[in-house]
């Protein structure tokens, strides 16, 4: 639980990430505008921003992965995934800004500094308490 909270605290320090709550069955994409430091009460952590919040049962977080996933065309997504008891059970994902998109979600030339932020996080956490790095190919229908 300590590594989970350490990572959540660090991820909530900037409001340029997108938080996706839930997994394959139901999910909610949320801006991190106004995100606050997480608050712990018992086994639950509350993550809150200007227009949303969620309560995560820390006991359900059984895995953390730093993921680079092929997404649309030649673009990649960079995120941290908190998984549940079943590995495919995604609880929360935190997406770093896409290096191929500007702040208005318009396609631009690749911005390597956006990948650097992800890589710095990854390099600090992967290997600690079972945290993994995963590269995912594009999902086919």
Outline where the language-model segments fall.
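N-terminal recruitment modules of adaptor/scaffold proteins
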Residues: 1-58, 62-68, 127-141
